[in-house]
Amino acid sequence: MTKKVIRKPDSLHEVFERKGGSAPTATHYCAGCGHGILHKLIGEAIDELGIQERSVMISPVGCAVFAYYYFDCGNVQVAHGRAPAVGTGISRAEDTPVVLLYQGDGDLASIGLNETIQAANRGEKMAVFFVNNTVYGMTGGQMAPTTLIGEVTVTCPGGRDPRYAGYPLHMCELLDNLQAPVFIERVSLADPKSIRKAKRAVKRALEIQRDGKGYAFVEVLSPCPTNLRQDAEGAERFLKEEMEREFPVKNFRDRSSETEPLIRSESDFSRESLDRIFQIKEDSVPDPVDDPEFREVRVKIAGFGGQGVLSMGLTLAQAACSEGRHTSWYPAYGPEQRGGTSSCGVVISGERVGSPAVDTPDVLVAFNQPSLDEFAGDVREGGIVLYDTATADFSKKENLRAIGVPALEIAKEHGTGRAANTAMLGVMMALGITGLDEESFRDAIRFTFSGKDKIIDINLKILEAGADWARKNLEGEF
């Protein structure tokens, strides 16, 4: 003969040691709060489905932020409204997790609304339990996105007025417009009969996660007697007569029987795969070699978008890589495709680069006047400023070595005005200010434009033209 034992589910701690305090077997929730009921329903469903070891409970800011006190499974606390983002990461990073999101209306339907819609639209594998009690519970009962018309709260003492605060947000109806969700249902905790129905919805949502079928959403109409100043009878009446009238209790969809498990391809971030994707060969990018004797050089390159600022930096960084130097390339640019401000920093070092940011450059290469005006003051004392005389003018300063280079003119004379950046690279190559061999610059040009023989030839020609100009006009400069 079996004996019925009334006890907590195994997936809920018997004693809440993480909570601490003088009452380690009591929750931190107010008397009559619906969170305790829903916790038990979820715990029972986890036990019945045998998924305790696979379950990860995600609890953002709100009354249930301390859900990890109670659930004996994986637990992650997250920032306000960001549970879907973290849940997506866990769901995709692990093979078979059962991801549970436990969110309130002030969290999910307000600051987290976009996150929720996007995760639902992608059909992420997660069960979302949305607790709708019409107020911000943790912070004292302020108006929430789900507050009823005319309902009095701390922040709408005259009742919610739709002329100023809009109408209650219906999350189930909103998500039901999307194609991806597998299961959407609204339930209530108004009375024992409603709670039994809620248990079935909770279990179905977790079954879908157990089977890896996709997104499940359960909205739970829940009492908040403390903030709404209700006794047990008043809370039940409010749920049945007001909340359920505004938010009808119903199943919106259950496609679990016709949905196959969602299996995503496994990501491959191995070095071999990345090298293949970016066409990196071992002989083109050797591992850097420590050389404490090599003097670090920090270069800032700036100009308008479309002047080849970023590609010049990449080519310079490639030249350094080909010599086995530690190097970094760090871009900064505006939203414009052409004409906006663009810059990048390149660090060439004999040791590991600590930061790619070039705040105090040794060398500034400026292709326009705004770049000179903005960055010349940052160049270290004794540093070098190279600028294109076609687009900028610079008054020499005693503590800087400024060189005007007709880069645009050189490029036009030798093939194309679009390669003024390559002409400037040639000047840097001839001056030897980077500590790199000239052949490394040529190899970098070939690598940058690999597969484009005509472009390689033109750029090598302009590179040499820039270098020749420097040798003729800057002899003895360095």
UniProtKB/Swiss-Prot annotation:
CDD domains: TPP_OGFOR (cd03375)
Top-level taxon of origin: Archaea
Entry's pH dependence statement: Optimum pH is 9.7.
Record field: temperature dependence: Optimum temperature is 75 degrees Celsius.
Top-rank EC class of the record's enzyme: oxidoreductase
Keywords, alphabetical: Oxidoreductase
Protein name: Ketoisovalerate oxidoreductase subunit VorA
Organism: Methanothermobacter marburgensis (strain ATCC BAA-927 / DSM 2133 / JCM 14651 / NBRC 100331 / OCM 82 / Marburg)
Keyword Membrane assigned: no
BP GO terms, sorted: organic acid metabolic process; sulfur compound biosynthetic process
PANTHER family noted in UniProt: 2-OXOGLUTARATE OXIDOREDUCTASE SUBUNIT KORB-RELATED (PTHR48084), SUBUNIT OF PYRUVATE:FLAVODOXIN OXIDOREDUCTASE (PTHR48084:SF3)
Gene3D superfamilies: 3.40.50.970, Pyruvate-ferredoxin oxidoreductase, PFOR, domain III
Entry's EC annotation: 1.-.-.-
Gene Ontology MF term list: oxidoreductase activity, acting on the aldehyde or oxo group of donors, iron-sulfur protein as acceptor; thiamine pyrophosphate binding
Complex and partners: Heterotrimer of the VorA, VorB and VorC subunits.
